[in-house]
Amino acid sequence: EYDKDEVRIVISGDLFESKNTVSNELMTFSSFFLRQLEEIAQVLVLAGNHDLVLDNTSRTDTLTALFDTANFDNCKFLDAMLGYTSGCIKDGNIIWAVYSIYDSYIRPDIDELKEEYPSCKIIGLYHGLVVGATMDNGSIIDGGTDSDAFNGCDCVMAGHIHKRQVLRRNGINIVYPGSLIQQRFGET
């Protein structure tokens, strides 16, 4: 037994696979899926590289289209809440530090919030590559975001890499949970 108001389900990007090639069935299924999750607990969604066309951000992305039409009760699109920029959202005793793909992951002002709310845990939300992470084919990432960008976070929930792993950097766990739905054998 749990209190539904004290639990969060986080989707760290790539709810969709097809960027902006969307069918009615995909929108119906995605809406149904998120509605099922929000019955369990509040759902927090972060955009990933497959949820938008990065080289043409003037086009409406798939998540914005879904959230603008679905009218969810207990599901939040964090990037949209922050005006499609990185930033922080206080949620009870948690501060969600959103590193938004829309502004190339500008580091949120974590230090100021840590002083203002010293008893809150700061959880970074990020969808991208972290230097030193392992891809599902075994290769090690040497480009991407340096883990120093997450200093001040108590932990980071990351998406993009489909291989489950925990990176321990500067005393901070950066967790890639793996794929929501397995796409290839290497994602197991």
Label every PLM stretch briefly.
Residues 24-27, 58-62, 111-112, 137-141, ...:
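Short, glycine/charged-enriched secondary-structure capping and boundary segments
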Residues 87-149:
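Binuclear metal-dependent hydrolase catalytic cores centered on His/Asp/Glu-rich metal-binding motifs
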Residues 9, 43-45, 96, 122, ...:
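Hydrophobic/aromatic residues located in beta-strands of well-ordered beta-sheets
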Residues 1-85, 149-153:
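Core catalytic region of metal-dependent phosphoesterases/phosphodiesterases
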Residues 1-6, 105, 110-115, 121-124, ...:
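A structural signal for the main folded, soluble domain(s) of proteins
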Residues 131, 136-188:
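Conserved beta-sheet core of the metallophosphoesterase superfamily
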Residues 82-91, 167-169:
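Short acidic-hydrophobic surface loop/beta-edge motif
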Residues 13-14, 48-49, 127, 159-160, ...:
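Active-site glycine-centered loops adjacent to acidic/histidine catalytic or metal-binding residues
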